[in-house]
A protein has these predicted regions:
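Short, charge-rich binding segments
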Residues: 90-96, 118-121
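RecA-like P-loop NTPase motor core
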Residues: 2-87, 91
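Activity-critical C-terminal alpha-helical subdomain
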Residues: 107-143
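Acidic, metal-coordinating catalytic cores used for nucleic-acid/nucleotide bond scission
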Residues: 34, 69-72, 104-113
Length: 143
């Protein structure tokens, strides 16, 4: 008796049998503030599933140590970010794929426009999340 159905592989690709590599990117957040910004990004990480953030995207918050708590100047944030790029294995950071996000307020640069321009120029390779005048106002307007 003839087979009722003949199965073939006409609809499979040769790449279907090879190991699949899913896209994966890590975002490292470095914040100027030590209270509000840290709370916001911790909460964002906690509710990422409810927000529909792709599970293949890793969000990490780099918190400053006790000795670094007073180093909140955006120049210091850029130094921290550059240190990550110089020693990526220490932070499990892939310089070709992962991104660093620097979060700081612009309100302290109202009178220091040239310093602000220098900071923007020094941070070109990073993603900047600048709140103007401050992060707390951003939260009030968006929550």
């Amino acid at each position: 008796m003839a087979a009722m159905r003949i199965y073939s592989d006409w609809n499979t690709r040769s790449s279907d049998n090879s190991e699949q590599i899913d896209p994966y990117r890590k975002y490292l957040f470095i914040c100027e503030g030590e209270n509000t910004e840290v709370w916001y990004f911790r909460h964002l990480i906690e509710i990422r599933k409810e927000l529909g953030i792709n599970p293949l995207i890793d969000i990490q918050l780099l918190e400053r140590t006790e000795e670094d708590k007073t180093n909140s100047n955006p120049k210091k944030l850029i130094e921290y970010a550059n240190a990550i790029i110089r020693t990526p294995s220490k932070f499990n950071f892939d310089v070709n794929r992962d991104k660093i996000v620097l979060v700081f307020d612009a309100d302290i640069y109202q009178e220091k426009l040239e310093s602000y321009r220098r900071i923007l120029n020094d941070a070109k390779e990073f993603i900047l999340a600048i709140s103007n005048p401050c992060f707390e106002l951003f939260l009030l307007l968006h929550v």
